[in-house]
Amino acid sequence: MEYRLLVGLEVHVQLGLKTKAFCGCKNDFGGIPNSRTCPTCLGLPGALPSVNKELINSAILAGHATNSKIRNIVKFDRKHYVYPDLPKGYQISQNDAPICNNGFIFIETSSGLKKINIVRIHMEEDSGKSLHLLESENRSYIDFNRAGAPLLEIVSEPDINSGEEAVAYLNSLREIFRYLDLSDCSMENGSFRCDVNVNLLINENDVEYKTPISEIKNLNSFKSIKLAIDYEESRQKEEWILHRKTFESIGKHTMGFDDKRGITVFQRSKETVADYRYIKDPDLPLIKLDDVYIESIKSNKMVELPLDTRIRLKEQYGLSNFDVVTLTSDKNLVKYFEEAAMTSSDPKRVSNWILSEVLSVLNDREISILDFNLPPSYISELVEFIVSGKVSGKIAKEIFLEMLKRNVSPAIIINEKNLEQISDKSFIESVVLEVLNENPKSIELYKKGKSHAIKFMMGQIMLKTSGRVNPAFANEILMNKLRDV
């Protein structure tokens, strides 16, 4: 049996705007329950919505970043369904005329770049949040602080063919939205949520069949998403072998994911679009966007996106794929690197220092690069001391620790503590001769082919110079003297 896994993703991104989508309530995470509500987001009679202009601007910017076609007419619809956390009895969304459609992004996979097509991006408001307490209390609470929060939903084509590709796609989307400062995209806080649609395209005797689509919900991490897709692939394959159920006969159903057991669990048959009874929202007029306005959003707000940055960093600085992927995980980290590399003769070594020493400090302190106390110029200056041979790598690490404590440049510490590397060959030769005279047994061991004797003598040279001697020069002179013994 030949088959191909088909995965489509519906991603909800809560935008980091100051106010909600259709009212003036503050758009923040957390806080006292029901403290950021008004008659509009609570759906009280007579309250009328008004469109947050920044919601539309954000959608346009997202459309540009995903190579989408952007509509000139914005229409909002009412999506009707009954649920306790939906106070109006409908959600303001977009049905048949999403603001963006026919887009695409590229993802990075183990076999290279892959194009993932995007069906649509539409604007909508979030619902409230239901809080289910212990069964013994026999009650639930609703927090409407989130009701009306501005959302973009990004729907992909089923172009994703593995759990690994799904995670790569989500990573790419999250990076794009973070680079554009549209959202913090925190799965933990619910500002980046994803529903996964999975089925199989099976080929038997040149006849194609599609298995029923499983929409998997309640996925709270990229790890869970990958596990759910991998499990659903094996489950649908087995079910096809046993029951040969097709999409035409069953349609679509909703599944949950049990994190503890690592399996998907059937929840319900999926409603059709008609169940939502979409109508145009009579309280929100059509909004016309001319081409000049749409392009102005791009020219004023678009930044270099992560994939483009990675390609440029490789070409401009000769960095490895690992380096550029790590650096571009945070646009502020890229900025820090480029400011340091700008004045350095060895950008690759600057990258190594940032990805090892600087990131280690950030992780230990649990801070971002924005809170790091050393400016990029200090890292560049320290690297230049290493490149020029004025300090060794070992001494540089000690200098770096002192820089962290005192917030001063490496030059100040080097001058104060007389740490500049000794590169005077005449002086080094005198130290080497002194070590040879003091260690005749090591010379004999060297003559017998014992390599550890060289390491011992180099250690003695370093000890006598407090680690300041140029190790390459010292090793060269030592080997020359040993050959003459």
Curated annotation (Swiss-Prot):
Enzymatic reactions: L-glutamyl-tRNA(Gln) + L-glutamine + ATP + H2O = L-glutaminyl-tRNA(Gln) + L-glutamate + ADP + phosphate + H(+); L-aspartyl-tRNA(Asn) + L-glutamine + ATP + H2O = L-asparaginyl-tRNA(Asn) + L-glutamate + ADP + phosphate + 2 H(+)
SUPFAM superfamilies referenced in this protein's UniProt entry, alphabetically: GatB/YqeY motif, Glutamine synthetase/guanido kinase
Entry's EC annotation: 6.3.5.-
Pfam family, one: GatB_Yqey
Keyword set, alphabetical order: ATP-binding, Ligase, Nucleotide-binding, Protein biosynthesis
One example GO MF annotation: ATP binding
Purpose of the protein: Allows the formation of correctly charged Asn-tRNA(Asn) or Gln-tRNA(Gln) through the transamidation of misacylated Asp-tRNA(Asn) or Glu-tRNA(Gln) in organisms which lack either or both of asparaginyl-tRNA or glutaminyl-tRNA synthetases. The reaction takes place in the presence of glutamine and ATP through an activated phospho-Asp-tRNA(Asn) or phospho-Glu-tRNA(Gln).
HAMAP family hit by this protein: GatB (MF_00121)
Protein family according to the UniProt entry: Belongs to the GatB/GatE family. GatB subfamily.
Subunit-structure text: Heterotrimer of A, B and C subunits.
The protein's name in its UniProt record: Aspartyl/glutamyl-tRNA(Asn/Gln) amidotransferase subunit B
Native species: Borrelia hermsii (strain HS1 / DAH)
Species classification: Bacteria, Pseudomonadati, Spirochaetota, Spirochaetia, Spirochaetales
